[in-house]
Amino acid sequence: MFATFTDWSMDVPEEGVKTAEEMWPEIQAAGALSMRIVKIDDTGARSMTMWPDEETAHKAIHSMRAKGAAKSGGEIIGSAMGTVLAEFG
């Protein structure tokens, strides 16, 4: 399993959730298994998307991020990705 994290800056982070919800079918069709979005401050959110493997993530992530930024009016201010080492709960 592989995870991608994207840090977003936007006026109202809750509005970004609406964009993500609209885009979820397309993201899922690209191979995503799940996505979580966390509000990290008044103008920021972090998304975590789980993928079956690194190759699937890399094929999809750049276009999905660009579409998300264009639709939400948000700006990507950081990102990270890597192989999932463990999952609990």
Segments and roles (model prediction):
Residues 1-48, 52-66, 72-89:
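Short S/T/G/P-rich N-terminal loop/turn motif that feeds into the first structured element of a domain
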